């Protein structure tokens, strides 16, 4: 093995150890790649939502993330749970846990916020609501991994109607500026 390859491996391993021990329970770029790859290997199609979904649409990581939000089709839900529990994730019951929205955490503090949906004649059924089919038409990248995600317009709509935080403000303003979308009224005070 050449010297530069050995140096790269040593650097990568040191960086990986550093991020594992000093990340305050964040889901890093490397974590996202690992999660996406393990689900892809199980032939599970996922759609990114939330902060990582925004960053995928933008094409780069724009902030830190405490979780990864994934939408999976109902037919793939059991295999998805089997894959992630096989990697050490356990369900964490939250106030908002439903049959279609669960949270999973591993011993390293990585959190997967799992959303289960199904395709219906009128669109996409999630948590008792029907959304337009194009909701999942977003395309983006996490590094060199092409991903499907919630489209920019739906991402902005999903950030309405609740008490938002600074990450929500960051995400909405970034989406609106990047994709030339109108900034929602409740976010205009942050311009």
Residue ranges and their predicted role:
Residues 8, 14-191:
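Compositionally biased terminal segments of proteins
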């Amino acid at each position: 093995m050449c010297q530069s390859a050995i140096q790269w491996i040593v650097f990568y391993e040191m960086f990986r150890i550093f991020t594992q021990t000093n990340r305050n329970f964040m889901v890093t770029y490397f974590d996202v790649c690992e999660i996406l790859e393990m689900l892809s290997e199980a032939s599970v199609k996922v759609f990114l939502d939330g902060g990582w979904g925004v960053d995928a649409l933008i094409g780069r990581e724009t902030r830190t993330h405490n979780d990864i939000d994934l939408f999976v089709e109902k037919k793939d839900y059991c295999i998805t749970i089997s894959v992630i529990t096989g990697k050490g994730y356990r369900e964490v019951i939250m106030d908002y846990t439903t049959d279609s929205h669960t949270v999973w955490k591993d011993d390293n503090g990585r959190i997967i916020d799992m959303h289960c949906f199904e395709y219906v004649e009128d669109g996409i059924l999630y948590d008792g609501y029907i959304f337009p089919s194009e909701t999942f038409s977003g395309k983006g990248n996490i590094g060199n991994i092409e991903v499907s995600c919630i489209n920019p317009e739906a991402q902005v709509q999903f950030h309405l109607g609740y008490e938002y935080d600074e990450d929500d403000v960051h995400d909405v303003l970034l989406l609106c500026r990047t994709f030339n979308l109108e900034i929602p009224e409740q976010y205009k005070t942050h311009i």
